Amino acid sequence: MNDEVFNISIRKFLKMVGVSSQREIEHAVARAVQQAAISGTETFPARMTLEIEGLRLKAEFDGEVRLEVPGAAT
């Protein structure tokens, strides 16, 4: 195994996931605000699942997506 190739591959994958995920979330929020489905001040629980079938890896990461700083004046 080439550690450098492995590490570069992981970084490229995670960068792609991060950029693509952010874009999807931004579009979903914009669409929901436009449709008046949300007010734009919510906090949403979020979960990301990482799976690599060949390694029998399944890891879940829980967090939240906030649309506004708590207690901020509007």
What label would you give each PLM region?
Residues L14-V17:
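Acidic, low-complexity intrinsically disordered segments
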Residues E4-R11, H27-A30, S39-T74:
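N-terminal intrinsically disordered, cationic/polar leader segments
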Residues V19-H27, R31:
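Compact soluble domain cores
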